């Protein structure tokens, strides 16, 4: 007589704030396959399209001769802001998972309208240095790290870390060409 059991999870125990809930709703709208992360296999959360393209390409190539990759679920977070929200959910379900995200830079340049020099017909912008909003999400990701997660951060971004180059457009295509 084998005993079988199911584990029940209470959603109210997971500490999702309003931003987390909104992030996850938007993720589900963009990628309805996100739920595959909860149904077994290895889970790799990647920040964006470039990482997603790279790991899908590698998985497809490697899985031809290696069963190790057949149950790898690569989940595209579609931006760093969603990564920590996804980690909260996976932590709640006590899933083991991996995360790859960019560190980005601490500061970045932004443009602000110079009201003194601008008119209705002609806008003049000043370039200013600001705290990079993407950088602030690193602490949110770090706060969600557990013994069930392994988080790897690409210094500045994926292209700089692995290909030693800065790419402005066609990043996924450029990435695949570098891997080939």
Task: Cite the ranges covered by each PLM segment.
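Acidic, divalent-metal-binding catalytic cores of TOPRIM
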Residues: 1-180
